């Protein structure tokens, strides 16, 4: 599956680059995280999406319910359901793999499946690999997914997901 970022996503890309540059400037080093076992449960209330194509009338508010089971310092399983950008309900299941860090920000991707997008496989399930950044502090965290545009079927966005640790 080939993704492309459109010219209109330049503002979003500039914002991402500024975030990464700021993190790199503040951090002592770029680190490879050592994988050690964990048992943490996080819950989230969905997403807020800042779409690159602002003229499409897409839904930026994506409420829902999701969970993340962090079984390692570098990996976690995730599942959830939310009201998507196309104003339809979507479900997802996947695995975050984030083996790198710049300061307190973990870097990697979430790989899994999504459904509910009418223009993508008629709303059926499809695979996706999405770059992600994560920051966690005690019982609160934030996942930032950098969702690329895919043809005229999926619209690119910066997807912000607030999460809360409920068990460790």
Model regions and ranges:
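Hydrophobic, lipid-facing positions within transmembrane beta-strands of outer-membrane proteins
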Residues: 41, 61-65, 75, 89-93, ...
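Repeated loop/turn-to-beta-strand initiation elements of outer-membrane beta-barrel proteins
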Residues: 41, 73-77, 103-105, 133-144, ...
């Amino acid at each position: 599956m080939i993704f492309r970022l459109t010219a209109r996503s330049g503002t979003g890309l500039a914002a991402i680059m500024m975030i990464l540059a700021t993190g790199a400037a503040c951090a002592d080093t770029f680190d490879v995280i050592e994988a050690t076992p964990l048992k943490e449960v996080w819950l989230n209330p969905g997403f807020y999406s800042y779409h690159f194509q602002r003229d499409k009338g897409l839904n930026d508010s994506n409420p829902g319910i999701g969970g993340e089971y962090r079984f390692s310092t570098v990996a976690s399983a995730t599942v959830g359901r939310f009201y998507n950008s196309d104003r339809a309900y979507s479900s997802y299941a996947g695995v975050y793999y984030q083996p790198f860090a710049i300061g307190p920000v973990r870097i990697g991707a979430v790989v899994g499946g999504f459904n509910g997008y009418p223009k993508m496989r008629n709303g059926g399930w499809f695979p996706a690999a999405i770059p992600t950044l994560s920051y966690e502090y005690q019982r609160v965290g934030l996942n930032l997914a950098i969702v690329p545009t895919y043809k005229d079927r999926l619209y690119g966005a910066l997807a912000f997901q607030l999460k809360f640790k409920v068990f460790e």
